[in-house]
């Protein structure tokens, strides 16, 4: 029976292990990995590989991994080895990641596109497969004779069932500006993180309110007709979308959205765990990601973006005479927050980078607020409703239509006496 192999790659400095002071708040990657059932209701096996983020370990490793990307290539090869060691024809591949982990699984998908997925008896060639991918010259491009010959001789021809990422940042998942950025580009620029046709379903959760320059969003450009791609904007900064803050009300919205997408494709979750661990709240705390270091070194702010913020649905020049599509839209919870978070001490939620047509919810959806229970949206199988959040959630209800009166008939002359 076909199995599901799931890679869950966490962001920089993120781990599921306890630190001083107890267990760290889990990221969405940790929750996703813990929520996946090992055996489905029909007896299929689901095997999860969790990869902690780069920069874990000694203070030196934290510095090298967080700033310089140390360990990134090793992480990609480790994920690839997990798939090589476990894959059998017919198995489905699911790849999930947050932040630098998102870059990791995107690059992993690029490596599979270039070198294929090695058959188990050729696992000793993983280094060769990575070198072939790393070269990225005309001679070793995925469509080159050498790459095709390598895949045909040693690898499975596989497709990726689902590629899901939370706030994939930076063209390389690394700093992209200044001397350090140029060095990182020269060292890691070979990675292929574009969306190719061998990915069947791709989902990207993006943070509306992030404004740090190194955290430029890496938006997919969709070139494959018929490919299922959604890039959805959520309220919050980087970790409000990918998780890791004590208040997980906002990040759980992005998690529940991703789980629903994966469940619709067949991935099954432990309903008991999800009901305890996932608590969505559109009015959850929006954290300030500008740490003291970022505030002191204001050069990290994004001068290219208005008000230092991200551009949503940014117009892109045509390519080869064809429009470039990104399939971006804003999640419904943002509209809910626009209506809910409007009182002290937080004040109104009004991100200045929302497109004009989205800054105010459509008129037909604004006037009426009803409890979610009165109009609960349909959910994908395998993802139960989360437990009641701290604040009562509200759904936007349609504006009731006003009755239209028939035009009055012209008066008739009274009958003659």
Segment roles from a protein language model:
Residues 1-417:
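Active-site- or binding-pocket-proximal scaffold segments within functional domains
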């Amino acid at each position: 029976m076909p199995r599901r192999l799931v890679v869950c790659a966490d962001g920089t400095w993120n781990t599921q292990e306890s630190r001083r002071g107890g267990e760290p708040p889990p990221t969405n990657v940790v929750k996703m990995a813990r929520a996946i059932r090992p055996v489905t209701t029909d007896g299929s096996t689901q095997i999860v590989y969790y990869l902690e983020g780069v920069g874990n370990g000694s203070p030196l490793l934290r510095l090298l991994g967080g700033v310089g990307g140390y360990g990134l290539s090793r992480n990609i090869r480790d994920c690839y080895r997990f798939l090589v060691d476990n894959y059998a024809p017919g198995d489905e591949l699911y790849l999930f990641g947050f932040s630098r982990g998102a870059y990791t699984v995107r690059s992993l998908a690029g490596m599979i596109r270039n070198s294929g997925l090695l058959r188990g008896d050729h696992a000793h060639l993983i280094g060769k497969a990575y070198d072939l991918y790393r070269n990225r010259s005309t001679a070793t491009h995925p469509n080159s004779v050498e790459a095709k010959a390598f895949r045909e001789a040693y690898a499975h021809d596989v497709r990726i069932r689902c590629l899901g990422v939370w706030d994939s940042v930076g063209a390389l998942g690394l700093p992209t500006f200044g001397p350090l950025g140029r060095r990182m580009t020269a060292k890691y620029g070979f990675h292929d993180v574009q969306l190719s046709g061998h990915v069947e379903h791709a989902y990207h959760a993006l943070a509306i309110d992030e404004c740090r320059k190194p955290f430029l969003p890496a938006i997919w450009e969709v070139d494959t007709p018929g490919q299922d791609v959604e890039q959805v904007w959520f309220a919050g900064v980087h970790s409000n979308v990918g998780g890791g803050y004590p208040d997980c009300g906002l990040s759980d919205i992005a998690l529940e959205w991703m789980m629903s997408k994966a469940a619709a494709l067949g991935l099954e979750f432990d309903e008991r765990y999800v009901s305890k661990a996932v608590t969505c709240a559109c009015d959850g705390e929006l954290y300030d990601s500008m740490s003291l270091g970022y505030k002191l070194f204001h050069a990290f702010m994004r001068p290219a973006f208005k008000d230092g913020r991200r551009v949503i649905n940014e117009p892109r020049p045509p390519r080869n005479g064809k429009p470039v599509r990104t399939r971006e839209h804003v999640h419904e919870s943002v509209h809910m927050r626009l209506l809910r978070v409007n009182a002290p001490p937080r004040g109104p939620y009004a991100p200045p980078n929302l497109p004009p047509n989205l800054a105010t919810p459509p008129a037909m959806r604004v006037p009426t607020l009803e409890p979610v229970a009165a109009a609960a949206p349909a959910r994908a199988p395998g993802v139960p409703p989360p437990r009641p959040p701290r604040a009562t959630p509200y759904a936007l209800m349609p504006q009731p239509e006003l009755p239209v009166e028939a035009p009055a008939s012209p008066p008739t002359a009274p009958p003659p006496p």
